[in-house]
UniProtKB/Swiss-Prot annotation:
It catalyses: ATP + H2O = ADP + phosphate + H(+). The lineage of its organism: Bacteria, Pseudomonadati, Chlamydiota, Chlamydiia, Chlamydiales. Residues 253-330 are annotated as: Head domain (RuvB-H). This is Holliday junction branch migration complex subunit RuvB. Its main location: cytoplasm. It comes from the Bacteria. Its EC number is 3.6.4.-. The gene is ruvB. ATP binds at L18, R19, G60, K63, T64, S65, E126, D127, F128, R169, Y179, R216. Has 3 domains, the large (RuvB-L) and small ATPase (RuvB-S) domains and the C-terminal head (RuvB-H) domain. The head domain binds DNA, while the ATPase domains jointly bind ATP, ADP or are empty depending on the state of the subunit in the translocation cycle. During a single DNA translocation step the structure of each domain remains the same, but their relative positions change. Homohexamer. Forms an RuvA(8)-RuvB(12)-Holliday junction (HJ) complex. HJ DNA is sandwiched between 2 RuvA tetramers; dsDNA enters through RuvA and exits via RuvB. An RuvB hexamer assembles on each DNA strand where it exits the tetramer. Each RuvB hexamer is contacted by two RuvA subunits (via domain III) on 2 adjacent RuvB subunits; this complex drives branch migration. In the full resolvosome a probable DNA-RuvA(4)-RuvB(12)-RuvC(2) complex forms which resolves the HJ. Mg(2+) binds at T64. Residues 180-250 are annotated as: Small ATPAse domain (RuvB-S).
Length: 330
C-alpha cells in the first residue's frame, strides 16, 4: 500500500513536539513508568517536591524526556544543564540560587561534572542549602544560602562512574533500556501523526527494526524516509521505499551501520574473530574508544554479535553468519 506525505514547513515546531509531555505518551519502559508514576503522584498528593531522580542507560532512550515529563507532572519549571559545563562551584551556584520552588533541575551527563562542583550539590540535595565564599584572602568568609526546594534529575550513560556519595543521594533510580520493535512502532506512529506522515504499520516496522532499539534514532530515520520519498519517490512512502531510503544510509536489516560492519569485519578478517582490545579496534576504524563503548558496543552485544571477555572483544558465530563469513580455526 502506498501513501502520500504532506510536506510541511513547520518542522522546527515539531522538533520539540515529538517529545512526550506526559507518561501516557511515553511508550515502552513499562516497569520504570509504573514506579515513576507512583513516585510522582505520591509526592503531588502530599503537596511535596518529588525526591531526586537518577536515570541511566544508553543514549537516545528518553532520559531527557522523562525530566520534561516530571516537570510537566508537578506543574513547575525545568532548568537544564550539562555535566561537562559544571566543572567549578561557580558554574553551579548561579543555577541553584536561580531555581524556584518545585523546579526540576536536570543535569545531563552528570557523571562528567567536576569534583568540586559535585561536592556543592551534596548540601543542596539534602538540605536545600549551599555555601558560598565571599571575598578572598584573610577576609574571606563563608555564607550559607537557603535554596528553594527542587528536584534534581540526573542522566548518565555511565552510572558506574558516579561517586557513591552522589549516587546514594538520589531517592529514585531507574535504568532506561533498549526498546522492542513493538514499542518503537508505537513511537513512530505518534511521530508520523505529528509530522503529518501517512505510513502503515509495515512501513513503520521496517524503520523500527533498523533503529537499534532507540527512539531518537527511529524518529531521525522516519524523517529521512520522509525526505527520501519527497525527493526520489514523488512523496509516496511504503515499506519498499523505506527499505531503499535506509539502504542509502548503509543501514542493514539488523540496524547495523557502516561502523558496526567495519568493527565486525576487522575482528573477523584481521584478528580471527578475537579476542581483540578496544584500543586496537578504535585505531582500526578511526573512532575513539569512548565512542565505540558508548554508541556501538552495547548494541552489538545486545544482538549477540560480540562478547566481552577478560582478554578483549570476540566476534560470535552470529557475527560470522551475518557477514557471510566462515568461522576460521584459531
Amino acid at each position: 500500500m502506498t501513501h502520500k506525505i504532506s510536506v510541511l514547513h513547520q518542522d522546527k515546531k515539531f522538533d520539540f513536539s515529538l517529545r512526550p509531555k506526559k507518561l501516557t505518551e511515553f511508550y515502552g519502559q513499562k516497569q520504570l513508568k509504573e514506579r515513576l508514576d507512583l513516585f510522582l503522584r505520591a509526592a503531588v498528593q502530599r503537596k511535596e517536591v518529588p525526591g531526586h531522580c537518577l536515570f541511566y542507560g544508553p543514549p537516545g532512550l528518553g532520559k531527557t524526556s522523562l525530566a520534561h515529563i516530571m516537570a510537566n507532572t508537578v506543574g513547575k519549571g525545568l532548568v537544564i544543564a550539562s555535566g561537562p559545563q559544571l566543572l567549578k562551584p561557580s558554574d553551579l551556584i548561579g543555577l541553584l540560587t536561580g531555581l524556584q520552588e518545585g523546579d526540576v533541575f536536570f543535569i545531563d551527563e552528570i557523571h562528567r561534572m567536576g569534583k568540586t562542583a559535585e561536592e556543592y550539590l551534596y548540601p543542596a540535595m539534602e538540605d536545600f542549602k549551599v555555601d558560598i565564599t565571599l571575598d578572598s584572602g584573610p577576609g574571606a568568609r563563608s555564607v550559607r544560602l537557603d535554596l528553594a526546594p527542587f528536584t534534581l534529575v540526573g542522566a548518565t550513560t555511565r552510572a558506574g562512574m558516579l561517586s557513591e556519595p552522589l549516587r546514594t543521594r538520589f531517592a529514585f533510580t531507574g535504568r532506561v533500556d533498549y526498546y522492542n520493535e513493538e514499542d518503537l512502532v508505537a513511537i513512530l506512529s505518534r511521530s508520523a501523526q505529528l509530522l503529518s506522515i501517512e505510513a502503515n504499520k509495515e512501513t513503520l516496522l521496517e524503520i523500527a527494526r533498523r533503529a537499534r532499539g532507540t527512539p531518537r534514532l527511529a524518529n531521525n530515520l522516519l524523517r529521512w524516509v520522509r525526505d527520501f520519498a519527497q525527493m526520489r519517490e514523488g512523496n509516496c512512502i511504503n515499506s519498499v521505499v523505506a527499505e531503499k531510503a535506509l539502504a542509502m544510509l548503509l543501514i542493514d536489516n539488523l540496524g547495523l551501520n557502516e561502523i558496526d560492519i567495519k568493527l565486525l569485519s576487522v575482528m573477523i578478517d584481521f584478528y580471527q574473530g578475537g579476542p581483540v582490545g578496544m584500543k586496537t579496534l578504535a585505531m582500526a576504524v578511526g573512532e575513539d574508544v569512548r565512542t565505540l563503548e558508548d554508541m556501538y558496543e552495547p548494541f552489538l552485544i545486545l544482538k549477540g554479535l560480540v562478547q566481552r571477555t577478560a582478554r578483549g572483544r570476540v566476534a560470535t558465530p552470529l557475527a560470522y553468519e551475518h557477514l557471510n563469513r566462515n568461522p576460521k580455526d584459531k
